[in-house]
Amino acid sequence: MQEKFMKLAVRQALIAKEKDEVPIGAVIVKDGNVVARAHNLMEKTQLATAHAEILAINKACKKLKSWRLDGAEIYITVEPCAMCAGAIVNARISKVYFGAYENKSGCAQSKYPVLTDNGLNHSTEFVGGVMQDVCANIIKKYFKEKRAKKS
């Protein structure tokens, strides 16, 4: 099941890449059904908060008519940053699955364990490395191409 939903998140990341956005995708699933999918839109919107996770959470909350996403799972192509990890915790998402680890800003495990911080009012389980090679290659290729264009 993890791979099935992560493939949908990968599809979202590829849509972002086509739009020249940082290729990160997110899918929220509840009771085995996809309730939201999104990809980064920071360049288009010029909003620092237009990360795939935040956009997917907003869509899921609207669809389910609740800010509490208890029992939901989120599939993300890259380990969430501090902002997104905080939003995941605040939304009460039950489990996070992510693909590529993000050593510079990942806040599930790599930099700071926001999702499992006992000092917060809620914590969220996570599984990292789901389709890791596929997810990591998408982001690496994107930034390699960006650097080549600057040269």
List the predicted regions and their residue ranges:
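Helix-adjacent hinge/juxtasegments
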Residues: 46, 50, 54-91
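Short beta->alpha transition motifs characteristic of CBS
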Residues: 35-42, 123
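Residues that line or immediately flank small-molecule/substrate-binding pockets and catalytic motifs
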Residues: 42, 76, 100
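Zinc-dependent deaminase
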Residues: 1-19, 67, 80-151
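Short beta-strand scaffold segments in enzyme catalytic cores
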Residues: 24-32
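Small-residue (primarily alanine) positions within well-ordered alpha-helices
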Residues: 9, 13-16, 26, 36, ...
